[in-house]
Amino acid sequence: MRLKVGLLGGGSWGTTVAAVVSRNAPIQLWARDAETVEGINRDHENRKYLPGITLPPALGATSDMAEVVAGADVLVMAVPSHSFRSVLEEARDHIRPWVPVISLTKGLELASGKRMTELIEDVLPGHPVGVLTGPNLAREIMAGQAAASVLSMADEIVVRALQPLFHSGLFRVYTNTDLLGCELGGVLKNIIAIAVGMGDGLGAGDNTRAGLMTRGLAEITRLGVAMGGRPETFAGLTGMGDLIATCTSPLSRNRHVGVELGKGRPIDAIIAGMNMVAEGVKSAPTVMALADRHGIAMPIARDVFDVTQGKRTAMDVFRGLLKSSVGDEAHPG
């Protein structure tokens, strides 16, 4: 029996994953925006988020959530963190028991500090939960360029059963049972990407970028391990791999925010000019709260938090780097 997949969310990444899955299984995408739905069904294009890219004819879309959720053997969540819980609550009345729910969202709930898989467990108890995450830039994948990702679930049997749904051609999908570590890597790298972008916006060089990425990965790993993740996870695709892609690609939303901050633009103006969400800006306050709760020093992430909150400028932060004391490489700072 072929599994039917329902995907909630009509953004660039959700549309990309839906296109990949459509090669392996029947899939239907839900989006609130009527123009997005019409464009996918009539023209096989998501003009708002993936203009100029032709989608597979097998991919259909609808604004009827009940239709998508009720018929799904697997449900994929591709909505921003700020609306994740409310969309789950809408879906709750229509989902069948024990249907696996996979998150594509790399963020935290602002009010609770919870990861998206924790929200799934809150709203849909008893459903297997997982994430698809890694160094995955939507436009590159839609252009047919090779990429690797990770499907992570706590249950090894379930994750291996679902792996073939997402693995397709040059889009290679590995499995990992460290759900917490994989999910946190995708969240935390966004903040480091903003820091790297600030350096790029200020005209810093490759040495600065390499230093920020390396020290940033150390911060990610320290917090991730303190929260229960496995150290090796953060050296893999969902940690270092995702960090490299997000910190270096001109397609990265979080890096773009950092670049504009480095140029001196205010955060509100930057966000207002984007039609997609930069999760790192929203996650920064929650990540700082988690770091404080676990007693983990994250100086780079804290600098990003200060700048995105308007407490300091990118120039102030980078000047401060030159004045901070240094010690053993294994220590924070």
UniProtKB/Swiss-Prot annotation:
Coiled coil spans: none
Active site residues of this protein: K189
Positions annotated to bind NADPH: S12, W13, R32, K106, A138, R253, V277, E279
An annotated GO BP: carbohydrate metabolic process
Signal peptide start and end residues: none
PROSITE patterns membership: NAD_G3PDH
Enzyme class: oxidoreductase
Cellular localisation: Cytoplasm
Reactions that this protein is recorded to catalyse: sn-glycerol 3-phosphate + NAD(+) = dihydroxyacetone phosphate + NADH + H(+); sn-glycerol 3-phosphate + NADP(+) = dihydroxyacetone phosphate + NADPH + H(+)
Protein purpose: Catalyzes the reduction of the glycolytic intermediate dihydroxyacetone phosphate (DHAP) to sn-glycerol 3-phosphate (G3P), the key precursor for phospholipid synthesis.
Name used for this protein in its record: Glycerol-3-phosphate dehydrogenase [NAD(P)+] 2
Organism: Sphingopyxis alaskensis (strain DSM 13593 / LMG 18877 / RB2256) (Sphingomonas alaskensis)
